[in-house]
């Protein structure tokens, strides 16, 4: 260690970069599950991507995370890089975000974003509470593309993916060294296969750098013929904490926004904490005794703190959620005696 020229070098077991990081919980249990595989989990510093087509609530999920971070740290500030200008101040107000703690930076090309964000990161010290949101990189042009347009040059731009890869390659070390959460809104496109699938735009650089990539799908929520909101599905494309390809439902209504209790009913039905004795009715189950509660609930009656609090506090429900969604952190290599037993069986 004495010969290294890097000041932050340390014995691995003592390194501050491998200590447990603060986890920031959001107010929506299902979002916490998507981020960490735990009801009472949340997100840690690193790169999170919310990707999907237009009007898929990508910015809202990003601001929900930013709000949780700024509530946890009263001295926290947000750097908001804006290329789409579709997020007015009223949007921040609806999430209860103090806009006096938000630095709004308009951007027009990838290089402009890269230069400014790196300048900001060079000035940020470990221990500073800063969260960064980029909305978005999906339609952000490269500098060459802009210059070609001004010159009326219609040649294809081959630099954009390289510049995006360069951007995320440069910022990723800072996120981990300085404990900075970076939340990026991005677009998706459909592959041209027979059974097409959604792919995050921007090339491989985003995939390599991201800790979490969520691809959003949706379907309409109707009351009769009127559309009252959307049912979103968070598809876990990549995660360091959650099993990939997991699907977490989230409900959003025009009147009440994101439902705090989104997705929990399906999970509780699967775990056995709630049963559906007949169409449109639900009952809770005491998992210690196996007894079914006397009270029956309509769907709308399940959207309440009193209904969910006992279930969310139940260790068995938490264990079910973690087993279903959390990525395993068990030993990668087999124990020596297990390996020896395998060889002995082969020799017989």
Question: Positions of the model-derived regions?
Answer:
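The Walker A/P-loop phosphate-binding site
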Residues: 1-101, 118-122
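Catalytic P-loop NTPase motifs of RecA-like helicase/translocase cores
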Residues: 87, 140-141, 191-192
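Phosphate-binding/switch region of NTP-binding enzymes
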Residues: 157-271
């Amino acid at each position: 260690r004495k010969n290294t020229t890097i000041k932050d070098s340390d014995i691995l077991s003592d390194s501050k970069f491998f200590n447990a990081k603060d986890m920031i919980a959001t107010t929506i249990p299902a979002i916490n599950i998507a981020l960490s595989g735990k009801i009472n989990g949340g997100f840690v510093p690193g790169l999170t991507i919310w990707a999907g087509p237009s009007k898929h609530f990508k910015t809202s999920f990003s601001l929900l995370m930013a709000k949780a971070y700024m509530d946890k740290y009263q001295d926290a500030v947000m750097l908001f890089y804006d290329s789409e200008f579709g997020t007015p101040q009223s949007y921040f107000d609806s999430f209860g975000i103090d806009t006096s703690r938000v630095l709004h930076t308009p951007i027009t090309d990838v290089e402009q974003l890269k230069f400014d964000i790196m300048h900001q990161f060079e000035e940020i010290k470990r221990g500073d509470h800063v969260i960064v949101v980029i909305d978005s990189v999906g339609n952000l042009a490269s500098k060459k593309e802009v210059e070609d347009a001004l010159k009326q040059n219609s040649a294809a731009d081959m630099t954009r993916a390289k510049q995006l890869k360069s951007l995320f390659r440069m910022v990723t070390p800072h996120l981990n060294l300085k404990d900075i959460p970076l939340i990026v809104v991005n677009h998706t496109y459909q592959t041209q296969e027979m059974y097409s699938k959604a792919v995050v735009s921007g090339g491989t650089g985003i995939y390599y750098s991201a800790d979490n990539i969520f691809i959003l799908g949706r379907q309409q929520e109707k009351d009769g013929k009127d559309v009252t909101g959307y049912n979103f599905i968070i598809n876990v494309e990549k995660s360091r904490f959650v099993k990939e390809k997991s699907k977490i439902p989230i409900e959003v209504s025009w009147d009440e926004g994101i439902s705090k209790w989104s997705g929990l009913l399906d999970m509780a039905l699967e775990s056995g904490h709630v049963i559906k004795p007949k169409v449109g009715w639900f009952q809770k189950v005491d998992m210690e005794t196996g007894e079914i509660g006397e009270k029956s609930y309509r769907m709308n009656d399940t959207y309440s703190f009193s209904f969910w609090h006992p279930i969310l506090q139940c260790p068995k429900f938490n264990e079910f959620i973690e087993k279903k969604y959390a990525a395993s952190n068990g030993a990668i290599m087999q124990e020596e005696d297990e390996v020896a037993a395998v060889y002995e069986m082969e020799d017989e």
